[in-house]
A protein has these predicted regions:
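Acidic donor-binding segment of Leloir-type glycosyltransferases
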Residues: 1-18
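Glycine-rich, basic loop-to-helix element that forms the pyrophosphate-binding segment
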Residues: 20-38
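Conserved nucleotide-sugar donor-binding
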Residues: 39-40, 111-126
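Short beta-strand-to-loop acidic/aromatic patch adjacent to the donor-nucleotide binding site
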Residues: 40-51
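Conserved donor NDP-sugar-binding/catalytic core segment of glycosyltransferases
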Residues: 56-89
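Catalytic beta-strand/loop signature of glycosyltransferases that borders the donor
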Residues: 76, 150-156
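A recurrent flexible, glycine/aromatic-enriched loop bordering the glycosyltransferase active site
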Residues: 96-117
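Acidic donor-binding loop at a coil-to-helix junction in glycosyltransferase catalytic cores
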Residues: 132-139
């Protein structure tokens, strides 16, 4: 990832933050980034093998923060292969998560959706857990206790799947371990 970011080094809007510690999981790396003075008003997820589905994705997220008066925004994504061909089940919108079901409806689903975006001022108060699985789910639950989580049910993100994905073709033992962490 750092090599890809370095290819954009000429663009002053791009900032590469490299943790100096070597004991950090994904959440720990996020935490270093959001505590940097260079981190802006919002922090938005983009996994290294995934893509935003349009040039308007980030603007739509910022608009949702304002229109829905939220501290966190979660979009919807489409499963694709590396040729960007849709894979089953296609669009993952978590349409069962609605305002009428309550803000803690996240407890009833096995994932929050993507991309996930956070208001940085709130995120710095909560902090990312230093783990490499479920760090975003833990934050979603923490945010939902006190803040509104906005939803965008249209596709914003392309989630590319391949055999080496951290959550591809998991054994039942690994699924149970992951679900225990979420519990």
């Amino acid at each position: 990832t750092s090599e890809a970011v370095k290819s954009f080094a000429h663009d002053e809007r791009v900032v590469l933050i490299q943790p100096t510690r070597n004991d950090l999981g994904i959440g720990g790396c996020w935490d270093v980034a959001i505590r940097s003075a260079q981190c802006g008003r919002y922090a938005v997820q983009l996994d290294s093998d995934d893509l935003y589905s349009s040039p308007q994705t980030l603007q739509r997220i910022v608009d949702a923060f304002h229109q829905q008066h939220a501290a966190m925004v979660i979009g919807s994504y489409r499963m694709v292969n590396f040729d960007l061909e849709t894979l089953p089940p296609g669009l993952i919108a978590h349409a069962e998560w609605t305002a009428s079901n309550g803000r803690n409806n996240a407890l009833r689903i096995n994932g929050l959706g993507a991309p996930r975006a956070f208001r940085t001022d709130v995120l710095r108060k909560i902090g990312f857990p230093n783990t490499s699985y479920g760090e975003d789910y833990a934050l979603g639950l923490a945010f939902s206790r006190h803040y509104r989580i906005a939803r965008i049910f249209d596709e914003l993100y392309l989630c590319r799947r391949w055999d080496g994905n951290s959550d591809a073709a998991l054994s039942i033992e690994k699924q149970n371990k992951n679900n225990l962490y979420k519990d």
